[in-house]
Every structure is written in C-alpha cells, then in structure tokens.
Amino acid sequence: MAIVKLRAPLRDLAGGSREVSIDGSSVGEVLQELERQHPRIEGWVLDEHGRVRRHVNVFVNGERVREDAAVASDATVHVLPSISGGER
C-alpha cells in the first residue's frame, strides 16, 4: 500500500491523520480511495471528472504528477493543497 501524507486542511478532514495507507495503481485510484475512506475530503482534491484540482499538487516519491501517474505499492504520495491569501 502507498503511504499518503496529508497537510492541513486535508489532515483535519481526515480526522487528524497525517498519513494513511491506501491501495491503488494510479494517483487517481489512490485519491478516489482516499475520498472513499475519508468522505469529508470529497471534492477538495478531485473534481467531478476525477481529475486533480488545479489548486492541488500531488507528488509521488518527490516527483510532481497528475492523476494518471502510476503508484507503486511502496510509494509515498504527498497531497498538497495550495495556500493563498488576500491583500495585506
């Protein structure tokens, strides 16, 4: 199983889990399973077509990837939502 590492706010939506173990052969499958296991995350990472949202960066073993990238069973997947703010 791949290890999926979560940052805020996703960590909060996953009940405070910093990392979860998830099966899947592609990034898309892993993220769909993440949403299935943690329904509060649904809509934050994947859009209605199953694609990674533009404001979310996904890295597999340190390489930025999209939803069709392969995921080995020993991979580490980082899911990083972009952080933005308003004017000062």
Each predicted region: which residue ranges?
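Ubiquitin-like/PB1-type beta-grasp interaction modules and other compact soluble beta-rich domains
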Residues: 1-88
